[in-house]
Amino acid sequence: MQFKVISASDLTHNQREQIAKLCFEAFDEDPWSQYAFMQNAVHVIGSVDNVIVSHALWTKRNFTVNTIQNIETAYVEYVTTDLSMRGKGYASQLLKYLIHYLTLSQYPLAALQPEDDEFYKKLGWLPWKGNLYVQNGQSLYQTEDVEILLYPLNKEIEAYLKSQHQLLCTDWREGELW
């Protein structure tokens, strides 16, 4: 499988169509159908014979973890693999590539809201065990019944996450808050 990282604005029409098809099959929506912030997403695609078979994207969000504020976080979404190609390790390979890319890009943290947390935990993602909040202006709103997984991308954040699980907060956004 060949990997490529492409900003949303640089995707070709064919790439957009392939990504939309993959995401619609998996999530019953495509990344562009609902939220304006997805126009600024960065996509990572895995291709076999020039056909996109696996996909993920991330958007930049600022997280607060306990007392550490403004942690630039790669918030990962729309992770999927073509239905006919599942079970071959493509999504795992894609996520390993993504983590490597984000580490080289000096992001301190990656996060996602999983549909299958065991899949991500096998790849080293850590469950957040504390409270979750979103911030809108000066107000904080606790969010319940949401599971967030984190992937520390540097040693400082990794050590901090192993010792602290009190408050995780991010910025308000349209649509799904997490």
Regions found by a protein language model. Give the residues of each.
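A short, internal acetyl-CoA/4′-phosphopantetheine-binding micro-motif in the GNAT/acyltransferase core
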Residues: 76-86, 115-116
